[in-house]
């Protein structure tokens, strides 16, 4: 999860500055649209996990996040920025929920608490290191390249999910 929250940290920290450099005005709407996507997905993701399995719901979430980062990197106007926010919120809402489910699925029942604790350590480390890494990248290469490079972490998360899931048909 740390690889995912690393990108989230960059999005939440630097979208206002990025939008300002693009002359897009009030980027606060980005976060409203992000929250709408997040809430919509979270309202239905539990049922989707039960019906289709964790992997079948995690992968589309990660694809949404990847698409959002691409749109964000190349945004030239507010509607594209807002679409990116919706996709990122939707993807993050799904990815966080499904990855937390995966962390528990890989643990024996007496270790569910430890699995959740470890999950959130990764979550918090991603946020902390993400802002630091994103700041360094944006200073060196600019916001657009920063968002493009951070896609690598979504790809790494995807590879790890595929590598360490209990089975392709796993459900909780």
Predicted regions and their residues:
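Loop-to-transmembrane helix entry/capping segments in MFS-fold secondary transporters
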Residues: 109-119
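Intracellular juxtamembrane helix-capping segments at the cytosolic ends
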Residues: 94-107
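A membrane-interface helix-boundary motif in multi-pass transporters
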Residues: 136-154
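Structural signature of the two symmetry-related core transmembrane helices
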Residues: 56-71, 148-151
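Helix-to-loop junctions at the C-terminal end of transmembrane segments
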Residues: 41-54, 138-139
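Helix-loop junctions at membrane interfaces in 12-TM secondary transporters
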Residues: 73-84
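Extracytoplasmic gate region of multi-pass secondary transporters
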Residues: 1-32, 38
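Residue-level signature of mid-helix packing/kink "hotspots" within the transmembrane helices
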Residues: 35-43, 127-128
């Amino acid at each position: 999860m740390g690889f995912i929250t690393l990108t989230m940290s960059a999005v939440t920290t630097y979208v206002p500055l990025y939008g300002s450099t693009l002359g897009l005005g009030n980027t606060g709407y980005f976060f409203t649209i992000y929250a709408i996507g997040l809430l919509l997905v979270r309202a239905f993701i539990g049922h989707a996990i039960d019906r289709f399995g964790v992997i079948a719901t995690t992968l589309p979430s990660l694809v949404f996040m990847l698409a959002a980062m691409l749109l964000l990197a190349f945004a030239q106007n507010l509607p594209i920025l807002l679409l990116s926010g919706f996709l990122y919120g939707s993807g993050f809402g799904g990815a966080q929920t499904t990855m937390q489910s995966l962390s528990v699925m890989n643990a024996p029942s007496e270790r569910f608490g430890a699995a959740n604790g470890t999950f959130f350590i990764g979550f918090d480390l991603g946020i902390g290191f993400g802002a630091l890494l994103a700041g360094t990248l944006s200073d060196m290469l600019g916001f657009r390249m920063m968002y493009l490079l951070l896609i690598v972490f979504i790809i790494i998360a995807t590879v790890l999910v595929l590598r360490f899931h209990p089975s392709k048909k796993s459900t909780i």
